[in-house]
């Protein structure tokens, strides 16, 4: 006989709790409302989210879309039972990819999949997503919560995010005038951000430390909490600098692959980025990871951001104006190098100096 007796099986008997899903929707409505912006005034719960480009102030917009996830950083959140900030990471990984193309993030949608839905856990996650949307100035207009028993182990979940932004036609980055001698600026990261966490977890395993242990690199913080420091969202400072100075030629979001994989993505084939590694101020978390795991500098640079989360390319005469605009918005700016000529088939990122780890 089924758990529901003579009435037969229910969806709940199969492991899907519709009531829990409805409760989650009620819990997250205030957070979702807090992300409203011009162009997005609808309520969640419809079949699709709406956005009015004209109301957002665009005349001849080009839409830019990005999607991403948080990777195995989620495993630390699950094991440490700390879910409040991974939603910020989810938004950051998408909207930072939009702003590097000169686009203003407009709206965001999320996908949250789990084996068994915990409404409180889900509300914490979506609360983080809403916080990230507020930081980026985009609206959370919809999402999908999938309870899938048998697909995920107990307590496990995964996240995916989808962001759409816009820029006026002719204002997209990178510009077509990047030249030899242009200066490369770096914006400080907030920590490991959301890449390289499979290696992070392996190093922590080697260290023998638990997630509740004091973080060796962050006084007064637990290891898990410190490693879960959310990814910095660079959107508003960069958009302001773009609009105020008109001098930003290219931006590169330093994610998986580090400097050597990400910087060349925005450069013409005849130019390379010459980075002075001595100028990189490596935060303590990366020094600890390198020492504890015996990770060589080259591997650190192709796995982690090593303290620089965003690259900005400007003409030499505009360095002061762009730096001042970004610093006024709270960014830490460092001059990292310059553009040099690149031979055919040569690397798009070259180094001088030594990384101090």
Curated annotation (Swiss-Prot):
Q: What is its main location?
A: cytoplasm
Q: Which GO terms describe its biological process?
A: 'de novo' IMP biosynthetic process; adenine biosynthetic process
Say which species the protein is native to: Rhizobium etli (strain CIAT 652)
Alphabetical GO CC annotations of the entry are: cytosol
Compartments annotated for it: namely: Cytoplasm
Query: Is Nucleotide-binding one of the keywords UniProt gives this record?
Result: yes
PANTHER family with a match to the protein in the record: TRIFUNCTIONAL PURINE BIOSYNTHETIC PROTEIN ADENOSINE-3, TRIFUNCTIONAL PURINE BIOSYNTHETIC PROTEIN ADENOSINE-3-RELATED
What name does the UniProt record give this protein? Phosphoribosylformylglycinamidine cyclo-ligase
UniProt similarity note:
Belongs to the AIR synthase family.
Known EC number(s)? 6.3.3.1
SUPFAM superfamilies assigned: PurM C-terminal domain-like, PurM N-terminal domain-like
The reaction(s) annotated as catalysed by this protein in its Swiss-Prot or TrEMBL entry are: 2-formamido-N(1)-(5-O-phospho-beta-D-ribosyl)acetamidine + ATP = 5-amino-1-(5-phospho-beta-D-ribosyl)imidazole + ADP + phosphate + H(+)
Pathway assigned to this chain's UniProt record: Purine metabolism; IMP biosynthesis via de novo pathway; 5-amino-1-(5-phospho-D-ribosyl)imidazole from N(2)-formyl-N(1)-(5-phospho-D-ribosyl)glycinamide: step 2/2
Q: Name one Pfam family in it.
A: AIRS_C
Sorted alphabetically, which keywords does the UniProt record give?
A: ATP-binding, Cytoplasm, Ligase, Nucleotide-binding, Purine biosynthesis
Which enzyme class?
ligase
Gene Ontology terms, MF aspect: ATP binding; phosphoribosylamine-glycine ligase activity; phosphoribosylformylglycinamidine cyclo-ligase activity
């Amino acid at each position: 006989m089924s758990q529901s007796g003579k009435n037969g099986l229910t969806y709940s008997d199969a492991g899907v709790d519709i009531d829990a899903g409805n409760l989650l929707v009620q819990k997250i409505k205030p957070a979702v409302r807090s992300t409203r912006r011009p162009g997005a005034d609808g309520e969640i719960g419809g079949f699709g989210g709406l956005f009015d480009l004209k109301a957002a102030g665009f005349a001849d917009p080009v839409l830019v879309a990005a999607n991403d996830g948080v990777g195995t950083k989620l495993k630390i959140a699950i094991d440490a039972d700390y879910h409040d900030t991974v939603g910020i990471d989810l938004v950051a990984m998408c909207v930072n990819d939009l702003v590097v193309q000169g686009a203003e993030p407009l709206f965001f949608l999320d996908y949250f999949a789990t084996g068994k839905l915990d409404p409180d856990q889900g509300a914490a996650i979506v609360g983080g997503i809403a916080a990230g949307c507020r930081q980026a100035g985009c609206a959370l207009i919809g999402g999908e919560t999938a309870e899938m028993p048998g697909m995920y182990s107990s307590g496990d979940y995964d996240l995916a995010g989808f962001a759409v932004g816009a820029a006026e036609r002719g204002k997209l980055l990178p510009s077509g005038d990047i030249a030899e001698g242009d200066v490369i600026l770096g914006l400080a990261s907030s920590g490991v951000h959301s890449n390289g966490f499979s290696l992070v977890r392996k190093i922590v395993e080697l260290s023998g430390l638990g997630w509740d242990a004091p973080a060796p690199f962050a006084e007064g913080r637990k290891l898990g909490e410190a490693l879960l420091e959310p990814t910095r969202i660079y959107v508003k400072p960069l958009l302001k600098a773009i609009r105020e100075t008109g001098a930003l030629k290219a931006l590169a979001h330093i994610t998986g692959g580090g400097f050597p994989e990400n910087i060349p993505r925005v450069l013409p084939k005849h130019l390379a980025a010459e980075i002075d590694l001595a100028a990189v101020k490596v935060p303590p978390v990366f020094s600890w990871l390198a020492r504890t795991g015996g990770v060589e500098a080259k591997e650190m640079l192709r796995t982690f951001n090593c303290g620089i989360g965003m690259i900005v390319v400007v003409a030499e005469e505009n360095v002061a104006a762009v730096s001042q605009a970004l610093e006024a918005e709270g960014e830490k700016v460092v001059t990292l190098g310059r553009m040099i000529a690149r031979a055919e088939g040569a690397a798009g990122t070259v180094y001088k100096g030594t990384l101090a780890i």
